């Protein structure tokens, strides 16, 4: 039965004792991050701690800690370091993304660029990357290589998104590739490092990495659906943000391929950023009624099935069941 004692970061792990151990693992990651970031010069501190103190889902540290439950040493100190490295990289990308997107709000608070300007936000993100690099050096050359490869994928995905879809590339294939690079790659690295440093077998580590990539892609698709389907800000941004910014997510791309009576109006609305609140509401209403939403949810279900296939081949231990609960949470939160 779901109780507060069994829930960690919104995910019902089913067992209060196991959940307490996982919660403690995530708390160790947060404590290490806090310790490392507070060592920065005071000229950095307010902007550097801005997003960290704003909270967030801590999805990536949670995935690291849960992946570590597959190995025989889930509480190894290196698992904590790996979780901190992954979350610092994630926070750094948020600072940089908000500058590129000119976002004004992040996690219910003014974004760093809105509060201090672009230069400060970029430098805060850079410092987070520097701190993550210093931490990962503790884990040895293989971990450094994994993180370097992940950096490359993150930047490639951002560049691919920034330059847009060329005429000879399918827009939906492009979208899914960008999501895998920008979101799936980092969660895949979380699974790989969590498995590695808990002593999981090589085969299990590879499976956890693949699982992370699939779950990361599903997580982003769910966020994109929430941005249209939800009346609240459960994705961490205002509903309709993607419409306002002119960002074409999976539900929009499918909706734009439809040929119903409302499609011409929807195409006109989604032709670029939408500033007018009434037009944002109109676009959201049309998107919610479009078959494109159902198609996007079908794709999300396919990724969930792929994740469950990977899970089924992991050992039947509490960690696997917890990862299955996380997959269910990822898919179900779009409502």
Curated annotation (Swiss-Prot):
Motif DDXXD motif extends across 97-101, 223-227
EC code: 2.5.1.85, 2.5.1.10, 2.5.1.29
- Which note does the record give on the cofactor? Binds 2 Mg(2+) ions per subunit.
- Please name the InterPro entries in this protein's record: Isoprenoid_synthase_dom_sf (IPR008949), Polyprenyl_diphosphate_synth (IPR053541), Polyprenyl_synt (IPR000092), Polyprenyl_synt_CS (IPR033749)
Give residues annotated as binding Mg(2+) 1.
97, 101
What gene name does this entry carry?
grcC1
Q: Where is this site: Important for determining product chain length?
A: 98, 223
Please give the superkingdom of this protein's source. Bacteria
Name assigned to this protein: Nonaprenyl diphosphate synthase
Binding site residues for Mg(2+) 2: 97, 101
Similarity comment? Belongs to the FPP/GGPP synthase family.
Give Gene Ontology CC terms.
peptidoglycan-based cell wall; plasma membrane
